[in-house]
Amino acid sequence: MKSFEVNFDGLVGPTHNYGGLSYGNVASQSNSQQGSNPREAARQGLAKMKALMEMGFKQGVLAPQERPDIAALRRLGFTGSDAEVIQRAAKDAMPLLVASCSASSMWVANAATVSPSADTADGRVHFTAANLNCKYHRSIEHPTTSRVLGAMFSDEKVFAHHEALPAVAQFGDEGAANHTRFCRAYGEAGVEFFVYGRSAFDSRYPAPQKYPARQTLEASQAVARLHGLSDDGVVYAQQNPAVIDQGVFHNDVISVGNGEVLFYHEDAFLETDAVLGQLQAKLASKGGNFKGICVPRAAVTVEDAVRSYLFNSQLLSREDGSMLLVVPEECRNNERVWTYLGQLTSQGGPVKEVKVFDLKQSMQNGGGPACLRLRVALKENELAAVNPGVIMTASLYDTLVQWVDKHYRDRLGEADLADPQLLVECRTALDELTQILKLGSVYPFQRQP
């Protein structure tokens, strides 16, 4: 039976803004308070989806969340009508209103961790929504994320969904941004690679000193247990704390893997040789041939990697066995990175082509091509069980562009977040979107009695 990797990209929400909410994310911090263009952001994301679909890759779409999150503000003590809640929050606690308006759910690499059926004990595709406990504005996402994923992957014979891990720092879980999978073919058993920043309960593990380590070893282990993964198909690795302190807040900012290939920076991990040895041995036991592509710090510094998002790229397998690397425009604008990429594609390795996309609206908030997509490896029968409304087609692309142009503003600043009309616009747009994508009532405003 055929098998595929399907990339489900996050659709940028109507409240996309530069709130500077993500401490440890250099781009998010440095672009704080700039004016944003939600319409352009959504169009840039859709253009990438369309281009990859037209190149023959399986492509889906993941809906954004309801923002501002009025229920979250009510939990923090703001009362009155929805409009009054917004106005009171704007007057008394603007940072809380900004957080409740964040469109950060567009970075669906953080939506969940996904294990394909070939790896799991019960032979189903498993999803665990990420609690994103490290940042308040993201910690409020997982209930809606779970409902949206449940509406997309609803057949319980094929798909299994788990609640987010306990919402405490010891089980901080950032989803697929700290997880990748190696395999000979997508439908065959593989090796799942979990990368963590610290241990919650074992002080012998080093930890970063400046920025928080968002993923714990204990969270990664819990997800592996929930998904029914066997020890011979799992490798845990600690990310280098020094690079976290340089702005590498998720592992997908310093490495990316696909198939039998790991593309990584020399400074990405602690005990790199041991990690690579485990990956090689465990993948070999599954019939695979692991290949590591190390980018030396002499060619590309960690600072270059963070500025360009070289590793926050998509590594995609072509029909002929070669690979395509999808990178943001910022890579072309960095001389050292662009020189390295030219060498990479000409040296006879698996990466044969680099494709550049303009994702500036997302990049200025610290999210590149890899942040915008959730990978789901599916066999042919499993793909047939996915809600067809979320699979990208030329027709769906056209419909979504028209939907964006109809509902999204082309300018959004902090003061605009206090406008109750923005909430009305967002709810109107999302109500229409659930009909376009055939999701049913997944948003809180649709579920109120």
UniProtKB/Swiss-Prot annotation:
Pfam families: AstB
Enzyme Commission number: 3.5.3.23
GO biological process: arginine catabolic process to glutamate; arginine catabolic process to succinate
Record field: compositional bias (Polar residues): 25-37
Oligomer and partners: Homodimer.
Residues annotated to bind substrate: 19-28, 110, 137-138, 214, 252, 365
SUPFAM superfamilies: Pentein
Entry keyword set: Arginine metabolism, Hydrolase
Function according to Swiss-Prot or TrEMBL: Catalyzes the hydrolysis of N(2)-succinylarginine into N(2)-succinylornithine, ammonia and CO(2).
Name this polypeptide is given: N-succinylarginine dihydrolase
Top-level taxonomic group: Bacteria
Pathway: Amino-acid degradation; L-arginine degradation via AST pathway; L-glutamate and succinate from L-arginine: step 2/5
Active site, per annotation: E174, H250, C371
Gene name in the database record: astB
Sequence segments annotated as region (Disordered): 23-43
GO molecular function: N-succinylarginine dihydrolase activity
